[in-house]
Curated annotation (Swiss-Prot):
Species of origin: Nitrosopumilus maritimus (strain SCM1)
InterPro entries from the UniProt entry: Pus10, Pus10-like, Pus10-like_C, Pus10_THUMP_arc
Catalytic reactions of this protein: uridine(54) in tRNA = pseudouridine(54) in tRNA; uridine(55) in tRNA = pseudouridine(55) in tRNA
Gene Ontology BP annotations: tRNA pseudouridine synthesis
Assigned keywords, A-Z: Isomerase, RNA-binding, tRNA processing
Top class in the EC scheme: isomerase
Active site as annotated: D226
Family: Belongs to the pseudouridine synthase Pus10 family.
NCBIfam families, alphabetized: pseudo_Pus10arc (TIGR01213)
GO molecular function, one term: tRNA pseudouridine(55) synthase activity
Name recorded for this polypeptide: tRNA pseudouridine synthase Pus10
């Protein structure tokens, strides 16, 4: 006796007691027969059984899937994508009735009705749009609520890298988060997590929101800077992840924004999982509490001979190396320092010697203060 012949009596028992649509009946047995179409199998099993009543399990939900398909198409009309997946929310009573049938007739290892609904919606959407169904890494994800009749859509985040030059002083690197949602995104900040765009982060975010759409932008900075610092040369590298973007391609490789210039825009797989190692070349203008001379300044050369210990308030200790150092005396109580160092060295604290050893004040044996410092290069190792 074939497997098909074995399931016919069970199917007939079910149909005597319950009216089932082709989809719901076929789903109970397709896996046993290694078939792909629930509807065709259900139709075959019901060839001698006719009924005009509503399906006991789904209440003829499958006859109405085109309504939800059109809802999906409308939701996706503003998105660029090549792959998708579908999730669904259905009435608990439908799932309960499905469980009753499967339990009563000991039908194990079969798809639940929720799985079948999402599969059917996926097939219909793929056929209509020619997009690929991808359950592992889709570019957009639909959540179709068949209970309350609405469709939610989310797109896969998009990560970009780039570099920015900041030729003006008095411009912050980081943007203050929205006070209402603490950066999570709300109606007040248009779900961006920030209400203003008056920083490096703000200007880049605003540019990308206009080009790509999206909600929040999460930055990974390769080093930080003072509000008064200039970022020169090829600029400071950064990574930014855009949540729920509408577009997935950025034609612009550079942008001249109001206060900064961005270059080398490119889409990357993801932001770095671990902090990247980098070197910074800085020009710092330093004032001293006492008169300095060339002989005293020569002591600064010793800073390249051993690591600089940096102590944080948390108790963490790290070591940074000064790779090269030059100086130029400005007047009796000030000089300019040109030095290259491993990323993570706090420049102002290095000058004053505040929890940094040895610091410039310690080397010169006098109180020193960093008036301002500018970055000439940030080199990722």
């Amino acid at each position: 006796m074939t497997t098909y012949q074995k399931i016919i009596p069970i199917a007939n028992q079910i149909l005597k007691k319950y009216d089932l649509c082709d989809h719901c009946l076929g789903r109970l047995f397709t896996k046993q027969l290694y078939l792909s179409s629930n509807k065709l199998l259900g139709k075959k099993l019901k060839k001698n059984s006719k009924s005009s009543q509503r399906c006991y399990i789904c209440k003829n939900l499958f006859d109405n899937l085109n309504y939800f398909l059109n809802m999906m198409i409308d939701s996706a009309s503003h998105y660029s994508y090549s792959s998708f997946s579908v999730g669904a929310t259905i009435k608990p009573s439908i799932i309960d009735r499905d469980d009753v049938i499967r339990s009563k007739y000991k039908l194990k290892g079969i798809d639940g009705i929720k799985t079948d609904v999402t599969k059917e919606l996926g097939k219909l959407f793929s056929k209509k749009t020619k997009k690929s169904f991808d359950s592992l890494d889709p570019e957009i994800v639909f959540t179709v609520n068949l209970k309350d009749e609405f469709c939610d859509i989310r797109s896969k985040s998009l990560t970009l890298s780039g570099r920015y030059v900041k030729p003006v002083r008095g411009f912050l690197q980081k943007q203050k988060s929205c006070s209402n949602c603490s950066g999570k995104g709300c109606r007040i900040c248009d779900f961006h997590g920030i209400k203003e765009f008056d920083s490096v982060e703000g200007e880049i975010s605003q540019f990308l929101f206009k080009k790509l759409g999206g909600t929040t932008a999460k930055f990974t900075w390769i080093g930080g800077e003072d509000k008064s610092s200039l970022i020169l040369g090829t600029g400071r590298p950064f990574f930014v992840k855009i949540q729920n973007p509408h577009k997935r391609k950025l034609r612009a490789k550079s942008a001249n924004l109001e206060h900064i210039k961005v270059s080398n825009f490119k889409i990357v797989a993801d932001s770095p999982k671990k902090p990247l190692k980098f070197n910074s070349s800085v020009e710092a203008r330093i004032s001293t509490s006492s008169i300095i001379d060339a002989k005293l300044l020569r002591k600064l050369k010793n800073l390249t001979k051993k690591p600089i210990a940096v102590y944080e308030k948390s108790g963490k200790r790290s070591e940074k190396r000064i790779l090269s150092i030059k100086y130029k005396k400005s007047d009796e109580t000030s000089f300019t320092l040109f030095f290259k160092f491993e990323g993570g060295l706090p420049v102002k604290r290095f000058v004053t010697g505040d929890d940094v050893s040895p610091g410039i004040s310690q080397i010169l044996d006098m109180s020193c203060k960093c008036l301002e410092f500018d970055f000439h290069d940030v080199e990722v190792k």
